[in-house]
């Protein structure tokens, strides 16, 4: 594939794998796509292969850093990042200034620095903004979202985890048609 065709080529290769192994391409994309390099969508190749071969969609993330390191950054400034992470868990992108980070992990002294570290570690994706050094970060896919949920459990952020857990339960009970549970919850 030439440069202009890379995105389509990567997407087509993943589609071919899904077709060959009778897997749902849309689910694979939800779980393992989401990073971008310029205009090229990047899938997590290891996770795609694991999911395609096993037939199970799940967290195959090879941690680039121990969960403790991630939770340390998430707990920056006594949990000031909770609101930012909550926004990202809901699917929003948040603005970040990556130019303030000095690539020194001992000098994480702002929310922007903490988010930039998480971008470097692969836990967040980044979209370049109009101004140099500014952009937006977001949780790229379901697989990484699960890593954040694991970190939230580790940190015991009940005010974030409980609504996520309750929302999941409400969704499951709605699919079952459990009107009594739905009425009680709402």
Task: Give the role of each language-model region.
Residues 1-10:
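Single conserved hydrophobic/aromatic residue that forms the stacking wall/gate
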Residues 5, 37, 65-66:
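Short linear sequence elements within intrinsically disordered, low-complexity coil regions
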Residues 14-59:
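Conserved AAA+ ATPase small/helical "lid" subdomain
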Residues 43, 48-186:
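Extended alpha-helical interface modules used as scaffolds for assembling large macromolecular complexes
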